[in-house]
Amino acid sequence: MTAQPTPDHLVTDRSLLSTKAYGTGQHLAARQSLYQWQTPSHDLPGIVVNELADVRGAVADVGCGNGKFVARVRKDRPDLVVLPMDVSHGILGAIPGALVADAQQLPITTGALGAVLALHMLYHVEDQAQAVRELGRVLAPGGIAIVSTNSRTDKLELEHLWRQAAGDVLGIQEGPARVQLSARFTMEDAPAILGTVFGEIRTIPLPGVIEVTDAEPVVAHLASYEAWADKMGVPFRETIERARERVNETIQEEGSFRVTCLGGMLVCQ
């Protein structure tokens, strides 16, 4: 069975994103936590802070989620004014100064920022071209945009695991693919999309291998896609449990379960 691309509306539905998917930080935290077992370990907030070394003034984190990057930038660069914003009110929680905002229409004056962050979020934006124009609009001359996403080759082992588990549940050789978030804006596609606004784009590749000896981190990652459970064409909970069994079987046979990762940041000017 050939994997079918995830329909755009499943990944960009603002109502779903602001409630089931990111109404709280629970699911995002589950996806982030899987990287605890990655080698080499990449300090993503630290990389952002390093890239902001020459930036002064205000920095917006568009699609800031649970504020992981906001907290680090505020800690390491107290001289910067950090503006957190996200489409979901719920996930913003108690982040000081956060506001609900749409990346396609940023509530920021033209040329007001020294930098803007758009980290693992442009694949959720319906009109990516408009969002990229907005990123460019709000930057002062010489300002930078830092964007992140995954490669189309990222975590293919998890896609294979899901389809095998789904096939087991359905009684067929291989089940349907799960919702793939970053497929709408991959590392391979990003330079062309960002290049419509930015003249200089530098990619920082972040490869690694996740290796676990306990199924739970992988299961938690898969379960974090619960917001799309009724869109996957397979009983969600049953597939999760079958995936758990398959991961445990691999660990028993091979000593661990491995996932190959490739994400990256793009620094744009």
Q: Which sequence ranges carry the predicted segments?
A:
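Local beta-strand N-terminus motif with an aromatic residue
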Residues: 56, 113-114
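Short catalytic micro-motifs in class I SAM-dependent methyltransferases
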Residues: 120-124
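Conserved class I S-adenosyl-L-methionine
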Residues: 2-56, 68-69
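Conserved catalytic/acceptor-binding region of the Class I
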Residues: 129, 136, 141-212, 229
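A conserved beta-strand element that flanks and buttresses the S-adenosyl-L-methionine
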Residues: 117
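Class I SAM-dependent methyltransferase SAM/SAH-binding core
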Residues: 57-105
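A structural alpha-helix within SAM-dependent methyltransferase catalytic domains
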Residues: 49, 71, 129-136
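Conserved Class I S-adenosyl-L-methionine
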Residues: 185, 191-269
